[in-house]
Design a protein with these regions (language model features):
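Fe(II)/2-oxoglutarate oxygenase catalytic core
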Residues: 1-221
Length: 221
């Protein structure tokens, strides 16, 4: 590499490869700035959490898929997608998130409600796909080039009602299993919003008994 090229690269944790800064949505160095996850206690009431589960059950759950809508052994759960038009509460829910984060709800995906039964899990992953993958390019086209900047996850069941099922961030050495109605907001990119940050890598640990319900709202801004 020339001196000029070296000045335009960052070292990544992915096989220690050096990537041009123009390589949007690649994995950056763990040393780049990253905003830690934030908890919002009692974002939803117990009754509102029960309502979301009820709405998902009424609409119907399908086997969760990852990467280009394919089933995968990396995830064993059931999923339902809900829009702000499906129920008056959902419209209010999207507005509540918009007001909390100061981001217009036009940047939100549909709400994903997820059920994990015993032995259910989601192995380590990033919520934002890598641009090198063909399906990722197609996904970005669908969302007008906007990546999944943030994940807004809400715990819908009492943590005492199931064993296991923690949300674990290995690069942060942090684990979350929060009270019902608590929201967890975490970033998927570094602070420049150009690269996928290693600290965003996380997993849904195995549910050993009981049922775990969460919902995910992905924000593209």
């Amino acid at each position: 590499l020339t001196a000029n090229q070296k000045s335009k690269t960052i070292v990544t944790t992915h096989f220690e490869k050096k990537l041009p800064k123009s390589d949007y949505l690649t994995l950056c160095s763990v040393t780049l700035p990253y905003n830690d996850p934030v908890l919002y206690k009692e974002f939803l009431s117990h009754e509102e959490c029960k309502l979301l589960i009820k709405l998902a059950l009424e609409k119907g759950l399908d086997v969760s898929k990852v990467k280009d809508d394919q089933k995968s052994e990396t995830r064993t759960s059931q999923t339902c997608w809900l829009s702000d038009r499906d129920h008056p509460f959902l419209y209010q829910f999207f507005l509540r998130v918009q007001n909390l984060l100061g981001i217009d709800k036009s940047n939100f995906e549909q709400l994903q409600v997820v059920q994990y039964k015993p032995t259910g899990y989601f192995r380590g992953h990033y919520d934002q796909c890598f641009l090198k993958d063909k399906y990722c390019k197609e996904e970005l086209k669908t969302f007008k080039g906007k990546p999944r900047d943030k994940t807004f996850m809400i715990y819908l069941t009492d943590p005492k009602s199931y064993r296991g099922g923690e949300t674990f961030f290995p690069m942060l050495d942090k684990s979350f299993k929060e009270p019902i109605g608590t929201a967890l907001l975490f970033e998927n990119l570094d602070t420049t919003k150009q690269y996928i940050h290693p600290k965003a890598y996380h997993q849904g640990s195995d549910v050993l008994s009981g049922e775990k319900w969460i919902c995910n709202l992905w924000i593209r801004s």
